[in-house]
A protein has these predicted regions:
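Secretory/extracellular carbohydrate-interaction modules
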Residues: 105-174
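Short, solvent-exposed beta-strand-to-loop segments that form ligand-recognition rims
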Residues: 211-230
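Short tryptophan-centered beta-strand motifs in secreted/extracellular beta-sheet-rich domains
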Residues: 67, 130-132, 193-203, 207-209
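Short, aromatic/His-centered strand-loop micro-motif at the edge of beta-sheets
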Residues: 176-197
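Ser/Thr-rich, Proline-interspersed low-complexity disordered segments
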Residues: 4, 8-15, 19-64, 249
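Extracellular glycan-recognition surfaces and repeat-rich motifs
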Residues: 73-110, 114
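Ligand-recognition surfaces built from glycine- and aromatic
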Residues: 224-249
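Extracellular carbohydrate-recognition regions
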Residues: 47-84, 243
Length: 249
């Protein structure tokens, strides 16, 4: 009797296991589909030399930086161009031979819309041209700084094409936090996820701006006579710089 009962129990379990699932359960199983995650876009190498770099033929090279050597970041001075608490200070890093604006410092690492710059050079630099390649992964603001001293500076700023703000190209003077637009151009901005070149030249009271090798604006202003050069963006993250060149006449 015990053996017969065991056989019956075994056959019952086998039938239950082999029986097809109810149609409702099968439909539910069909609905469980894992999403396909697209691969992270890779950043192509920056052209070398950068296409569109503008520099006088007889110029003296002050800086040439490709961020491919140890200590490259230590040659630059990181400055937050607006007052922010210590935990919201901007973070810049060198990754795979590029200078990257990398949001804000740990532990928060949050994006922030405040303005930030990486500066290089001496306070007595007066006449020079700075050029750089840049690649925007997801930021929307880029620029170059000239004659930075004690918080005052000139800036050539470009806004990404698909961003709402207009005009897209501006030469600005910033003195003690007050921004004055010296020249503007309502032309298309730059395209994201491709390498572009930006150039800013200061010579006496003449300020000239170039984008991808084409002149965009020229204006005269005599308020600021000397100071460091630099790279500008916002602490949103995702802005890469490479092939920085600074020359003097």
């Amino acid at each position: 009797m015990i053996i017969a009962a065991s056989v019956v129990l075994f056959l019952t379990i086998a039938l239950v296991i082999s029986a097809p699932a109810p149609s409702g359960q099968a439909e539910m199983q069909d609905l469980i589909v894992l999403p396909t995650v697209p691969p992270t876009p890779t950043v192509p190498p920056a052209p070398s030399p950068m296409i569109g770099v503008v520099a006088p033929q007889a110029a003296t090279t002050l800086v040439t930086e490709q961020f491919d050597t140890d200590g490259a970041l230590s040659r630059w001075r990181i400055v937050d161009l607006e007052d922010v608490p210590n935990e919201r200070r901007s973070l810049w890093t060198v990754v795979e031979g590029r200078l990257r604006q990398d949001r804000t410092v740990p532990p928060l690492r949050d994006p922030s819309i405040h303005e930030t710059a990486a500066l290089i050079g001496a306070a007595d630099w007066s006449d020079y041209t700075i050029s750089a390649g840049f690649y925007d992964q997801d930021n929307a603001n880029v620029g170059l700084i000239a004659r930075y001293r004690d918080g005052s500076y000139y800036r050539y700023r470009i806004i990404r094409s698909d961003y709402e703000d207009r005009p897209k190209h501006l030469i600005e003077r910033v003195v003690d936090g007050t921004v004055t637009v010296l020249a503007s151009l309502d032309a298309p901005g730059y395209e994201a996820r491709r390498w572009n070149t930006i150039t800013f030249s200061v010579n006496g009271n003449q300020l000239r701006a170039f984008f991808n090798g084409q002149a965009t604006m020229e204006v005269r202003d005599a308020h600021l006579s000397s100071g460091s050069a630099g790279l500008y963006t916002r602490a949103i993250g995702g802005m890469l710089f490479d092939h920085v060149m600074i020359t003097s006449p």
